[in-house]
């Protein structure tokens, strides 16, 4: 496939100071530099920024950025979008400068989520040393994974699988009532897609959210780093969304917490890596092997 990894997220924010505290003091990222003096550029590795937070009137996901290997692979994305009748725009000079890439295109999925595909990122070779000593699991696996909200799970399945070429790794059946369908109606599906060895880089939930994003997963190297982040979050009174647990599909050991933007970050380790030649996509019938009590997120 042409798309290789989730490379960056651009997030509009109403409280930049809260995001600065959260990104640097809770997540343990390192501040980078960029062309927008008002934006916060958060580094995890040699990418110029994996998260870009910029001020605005809303708290929402603005763009998810997806990396291709070269100009030929980006052209494949263009060709596939054109064949499917999906409009796209070429990146402006300002966008290319801000993302520090050679080329990019912008387009929307069937639910209106904005995506960018690009190639030729200019890496930043100043070492990233987290103030808390941990390293993020990125490289060919990219930033992590993102769960987007969708208004049509069937259309999203066709778009990401058939147009963009993502590989379906797992599915989870949800009660139809969860998305406003009758009890005897079609089930809703939570789909998990991969584009590299990470079990999934993308999933979508058929439920609208104010921010357009359900959660973003960030992975570190070991369970101590997860526990230390949990301690930092609790000390800073960050609202928890789910307790520590281990998922059944990607085996991630993680907890969930709220961001200043209202969506969740899953902070975890030990995520499963797969090989497409031998992987068999199946249906998961549980969320976690243990833990992940999401009721804590519903408490006042």
Curated annotation (Swiss-Prot):
Residues 5-120, 142-270 form the VOC domain. Gene3D superfamilies: 2,3-Dihydroxybiphenyl 1,2-Dioxygenase, domain 1 (3.10.180.10). Its EC number is 1.13.11.25. InterPro entries: Glyas_Bleomycin-R_OHBP_Dase, Glyas_Fos-R_dOase_dom, GlyoxalaseI/FosfomycinResist, HsaC, VOC, Xdiol_ring_cleave_dOase_1/2. One of its GO terms (biological process) is response to cholesterol. Its cofactor is Fe(2+). Substrate binds at residues 200, 215, 250, 256. Disruption phenotype: Cells lacking this gene grow on cholesterol at a rate that is 60% that of the wild-type and develop a pink color consistent with the accumulation and nonenzymatic oxidation of a catechol. Binds 1 Fe(2+) ion per subunit. GO terms for molecular function: 3,4-dihydroxy-9,10-secoandrosta-1,3,5(10)-triene-9,17-dione 4,5-dioxygenase activity; ferrous iron binding; oxidoreductase activity, acting on single donors with incorporation of molecular oxygen, incorporation of two atoms of oxygen. Keywords: Aromatic hydrocarbons catabolism, Cholesterol metabolism, Dioxygenase, Iron, Lipid degradation, Lipid metabolism, Metal-binding, Oxidoreductase, Repeat, Steroid metabolism, Sterol metabolism. Pathway: Steroid metabolism; cholesterol metabolism. It catalyses: 3,4-dihydroxy-9,10-secoandrosta-1,3,5(10)-triene-9,17-dione + O2 = (1E,2Z)-3-hydroxy-5,9,17-trioxo-4,5:9,10-disecoandrosta-1(10),2-dien-4-oate + H(+). Fe cation binds at residues 145, 215, 266. It is an enzyme of class 1 (oxidoreductase). Catalyzes the meta-cleavage of 3,4-dihydroxy-9,10-seconandrost-1,3,5(10)-triene-9,17-dione (3,4-DHSA) to produce 4,5-9,10-diseco-3-hydroxy-5,9,17-trioxoandrosta-1(10),2-diene-4-oic acid (4,9-DSHA). Also involved in biphenyl and polychlorinated biphenyls (PCBs) degradation. PANTHER family: GLYOXALASE DOMAIN-CONTAINING PROTEIN 5, GLYOXALASE FAMILY PROTEIN. Belongs to the extradiol ring-cleavage dioxygenase family. Homodimer. This is Iron-dependent extradiol dioxygenase. The gene is hsaC.
């Amino acid at each position: 496939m042409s798309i290789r990894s989730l490379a960056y997220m651009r997030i509009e924010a109403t409280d930049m100071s809260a995001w600065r505290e959260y990104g640097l003091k809770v997540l343990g990222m390192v501040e980078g530099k960029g062309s927008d003096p008002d934006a916060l550029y958060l580094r995890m590795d040699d990418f110029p920024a994996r998260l870009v937070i910029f001020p605005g009137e809303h708290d929402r996901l603005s763009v998810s950025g997806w990396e291709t290997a070269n100009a030929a692979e980006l052209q494949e994305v263009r060709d596939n979008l054109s064949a499917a009748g999906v409009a796209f725009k070429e990146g402006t000079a300002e966008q290319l400068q801000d993302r520090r890439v050679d080329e990019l295109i912008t387009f929307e999925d069937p639910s209106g989520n904005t995506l960018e595909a690009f190639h030729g990122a200019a890496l930043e070779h100043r070492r990233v040393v987290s103030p808390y000593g941990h390293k993020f699991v990125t490289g060919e696996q990219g930033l992590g994974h993102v769960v987007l909200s969708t208004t049509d799970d069937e259309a999203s399945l066709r778009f990401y699988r058939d147009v963009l070429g993502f590989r379906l790794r797992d599915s989870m059946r949800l009660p139809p009532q969860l998305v406003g369908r009758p009890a005897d109606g079609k089930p809703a599906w939570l789909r998990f897609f991969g584009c590299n060895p990470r079990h999934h880089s993308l999933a979508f939930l058929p439920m609208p959210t104010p921010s357009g994003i359900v959660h973003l997963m960030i992975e570190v190297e070991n369970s101590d780093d997860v526990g230390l982040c949990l301690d930092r979050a609790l000390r800073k009174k960050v609202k928890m969304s789910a307790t520590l647990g281990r998922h059944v599909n990607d085996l991630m050991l993680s907890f969930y917490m709220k961001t200043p933007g209202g969506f969740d970050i899953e902070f975890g380790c030990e995520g499963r890596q797969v090989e497409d030649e031998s992987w068999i996509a199946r249906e998961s019938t549980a969320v976690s092997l243990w833990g992940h009590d999401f009721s804590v997120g519903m408490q006042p």
